[in-house]
Amino acid sequence: MKFEAILFDCDGVLVDSEPITNGVLCTMLNEAGWAISPEECMRVFIGKTVRSEAARIEAHTGRPLTDAWMAQFYDRRNARLEAELRAIEGAGDAVLAVHARLGGRIACASGADRFKVEMQLEKVGLAPYFADRIFSGHEMPATKPAPDVYLAAAAAVGVAPARCLVVEDTVTGVAAGVAAGATVVGYSPSPVGHGSPEALRAAGAVHVMADMGELLALLG
């Protein structure tokens, strides 16, 4: 199939933010009384919003997940992202190449909050290529694995979801792209990324890349 647009996830696809965000979250959960390891924290929260796991957090900490706690999390997370964030290897070149090939018909469709997504894309120099085609699941009726954010992104680039290629690194994200009616490719660098190739394929990815350099060839 010849694709007419590419819709990118952000975290773990364009920017290497997950270890940073997970580190802050793990530290704060331990401070709140949940003795969770970094590995378990990544497994539980990858591809999800913190608030979507509020019941689990409250069960382990014995206290409600408050707006004040979330505000502190955002502040600490953003400070570390500003200081440490880097682009995924090869993501910059891939975005430039597909942007040129597709006449700018690319979008970023993230499950994260808009401030985080826009800040990250600015920091790694990719924001100009997405311009006003940046979408946050926080602003949709439902976030990933619901298809809403991908449906909004497809509408913004003026391409039917069935003619869009989605790039995702988590099972939750792959499910969202599939539910939108798009073709989804996974990204799982070696050693294994945030979703194993097997798990991404089981969720509906038709192909799993280990290198962003593969993306241009997948356009058809």
Please identify what each model-predicted range represents.
Residues 1-4, 96, 102, 113-220:
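Asp-based, Mg2+/Mn2+-dependent phosphohydrolase catalytic module
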Residues 1-43, 60:
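Active-site neighborhood of HAD-like aspartate-dependent phosphohydrolases
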Residues 9, 13, 110, 169:
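Conserved G/P- and acidic residue-centered "switch" motifs that form tight phosphate/ATP-binding loops
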Residues 14, 87, 106, 166-167:
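Conserved SAM-binding loop
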Residues 22, 26, 50-55, 70, ...:
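An amphipathic alpha-helix signature
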Residues 46-80, 89, 97, 105:
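A metal-dependent, Asp-based hydrolase signature
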Residues 79-108, 114, 118:
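Short, acidic loop-to-helix structural element flanking the phosphoryl-transfer center
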